[in-house]
Amino acid sequence: MEKPLVSIVVVSYNHAHFLEENLNSIKAQTYPSIQLIVADDASKDNSIEVYENWLEKNNYPAIKNFHTKNTGLTTTLNECFDLIEGKYVKFIAADDYLHPEAIEKCVNKLEELGNDYGMVFTDTWAINNKSEITKDIADYNANQYLTKEELREKLVLGNRIAALTVLMRTEALKKTGKYPTDIIVEDYYRWLKINEYYWITNIPEKLAYYRLHEHNISKIRLNLLLEEDLILKMKFDKTGIGKQNIDNYFKLNYFKVKQNKKLITQYHQYPFKDKILSFCFNLNFPFLGYRILNKILKTFT
């Protein structure tokens, strides 16, 4: 029986040093039916040369999406949408790589569970720049034995799904649409969108290798990531499960968030917001004013 086609999209930006390891891991898959799409967002190193040499040397067919001008990750991903031919799809950064059985086990899982399941993810090893296994600082193996209902609910509390481990139904990917071009937490956004329409499942095995780099993320970018993460949690929380954490963040960072219109606007729209806190933000009250007002109102309720 013919196996369903899986599209693997490799995305690179200055990953020349790791590219061969990634591509070799795709070639080594035990699963036979793979469409390879390779994309590069105008790397400053010799990534495209490495791609071309590897593809020629291995006589491996691939669709190429190589940029001469840097456009950003989400634009690159959106372009690759239109190149996907498989029933299933995996996106992977070129500095990560896969266990030989990763695709086969993920396809088998989704085929077994049926169309109600939009994606599957696995556990992952964390590795350093020498491909040595190291400590998993992101705690990506925290969801091992959750039920589908628990996964659906807890995903709103935070992202514990490593993007390189995910295999999606292409139908689920296309139903949830292309990425907003201004988003930087694109993987978490995608899981939350799929979570609205499909069940998500996991395989509690380490079937991928996630590379941790030694350089530090800038403080500005870290703040942007935290801000966007919080906005996504407010947008997708349908039950109030994240209310306590969200309210606490706004209280602890009252002065800072009061100056952030994007965050405040989303908080006003959050169905489970602290109404007194929202009111004080609206009137630009100092935090002491919120505490006094909150205390007064609580004495009458």
Label for each model-derived stretch:
Residues 25, 40-49, 93:
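A conserved acidic beta->alpha catalytic loop
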Residues 101-135:
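Conserved donor NDP-sugar-binding/catalytic core segment of glycosyltransferases
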Residues 66-85, 105:
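Glycine-rich, basic loop-to-helix element that forms the pyrophosphate-binding segment
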Residues 156, 160, 189, 209-301:
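C-terminal subregions of glycosyltransferases and related glycan-biosynthesis enzymes
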Residues 89:
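Short aromatic/hydrophobic "clamp" motif used to bind/position activated sugar donors
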Residues 82, 140-229:
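Conserved nucleotide-sugar donor-binding catalytic segment
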Residues 15-28:
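Short, well-formed alpha-helical segments that are part of the catalytic scaffolds
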Residues 4-7, 35, 189:
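Cell-envelope/extracellular polymer assembly enzymes that use nucleotide-activated donors
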